[in-house]
Design a protein with these regions (language model features):
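N-terminal export signals and maturation junctions of secreted/periplasmic proteins
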Residues: 2-58, 82, 98-106
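Export/targeting segments at the very N-terminus of extracytoplasmic proteins
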Residues: 29-80, 113-134, 222, 227-233, ...
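Extracytoplasmic
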Residues: 65-68, 90, 138-140
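Secretory-pathway/luminal and periplasmic proteins that interact with or process carbohydrate-rich
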Residues: 78-85, 126-130, 149-160
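Substrate-binding/active-site groove segments that recognize
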Residues: 88-105, 119, 123
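A short, structured beta-strand-centered segment in the mid-to-C-terminal lobe
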Residues: 105-115
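Catalytic and substrate-binding regions of cell-wall glycan-acting enzymes that process beta-1,4-linked
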Residues: 141-208
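Low-complexity, Gly/Ser/Thr/Pro-rich intrinsically disordered linker/tail segments
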Residues: 192-239
Length: 239
């Protein structure tokens, strides 16, 4: 099942979509994600096809992305199902056609080899952009927030973790264009059904900190425990 609400547009710059302790910067200028100590979480077991495993290994080597992160994204987005379709998102990594083209995709978006390669290139690009902005590589969860909520949404969540999550989404450029209803659905549509009971107030009762922490735990369940994405990617022979 995809972790992304089906109708969120993520093609624009602001488009929506473990055990290690670390301190979080207090200054808003840092706008760093503060999830706190990562708890030990029971691992979920997901079996991928040999074809997808091979694609993940090749993409990891080509783009210097941790295999653990790529596997976790695939598990959360589609369970490894290459035929998955959620609204306007397709394949193992639930890419839109716009994303697919932007990051060099050709041929069949449902092809797990192609879908994985494009997704890894996209995540590498987003990881590098994060590093330039914040002076460090992103955690797997931070990278997933960018993938799911968009660059603008992720930045707002990190800068204002104790604000209502939907309000942070509404204050992005895309949120202002599409309105509060869209922003609320961008959050509540990404709260799994089995997690909603802990938020009796509904979407109004979930802060960005709670939203990010919920996804950090899910990421950890699927093995996305690498502290940082790898640096120094080599793309098409150029570092």
């Amino acid at each position: 099942m995809s972790g992304r609400f089906a109708e969120i547009s993520k093609d624009g710059a602001t488009g929506a979509r473990r055990k290690r302790s670390h301190s979080c910067a207090a200054a808003i200028v840092g706008a760093l994600l503060c999830i706190g100590s990562e708890p030990q979480i029971a691992q979920a077991s997901v079996q991928f096809s040999p074809q997808l495993e091979g694609a993940i290994q090749r993409a990891s080597e080509r783009y210097s992305m941790p295999q653990s992160t790529l596997r976790a994204f695939a598990a959360i987005e589609s369970g490894g199902n290459s035929r998955a379709k959620t609204g306007s998102y397709y394949g193992v990594y639930q890419l839109s056609h716009g994303e697919f083209r932007k990051y060099g995709g050709h041929g069949n978006i449902f092809d797990p080899k192609v879908n994985t390669d494009v997704a890894a290139r996209k995540l590498r690009s987003e990881s590098d952009a994060f590093s330039l902005q914040y002076g460090r590589a992103p955690t797997a969860t931070e990278l997933y927030m960018i993938h799911q909520q968009g660059v603008g949404g992720a930045a707002m969540h990190m800068a204002n973790p104790d604000w209502p999550a939907w309000l942070n989404m509404y204050l992005t450029d895309e949120g202002r264009q599409k309105g509060p209803g869209w922003a609320r659905l961008a959050i509540w549509g990404n709260v799994p059904a089995d997690q909603r009971a802990q938020f009796p107030g509904g979407v109004d009762g979930i802060t960005s900190r709670q939203f990010m922490d919920m996804w950090a735990k899910k990421m950890a369940r699927f093995g996305g425990s690498a502290r940082d994405a790898y640096a120094g990617a080599v793309v098409d022979g150029v570092q």
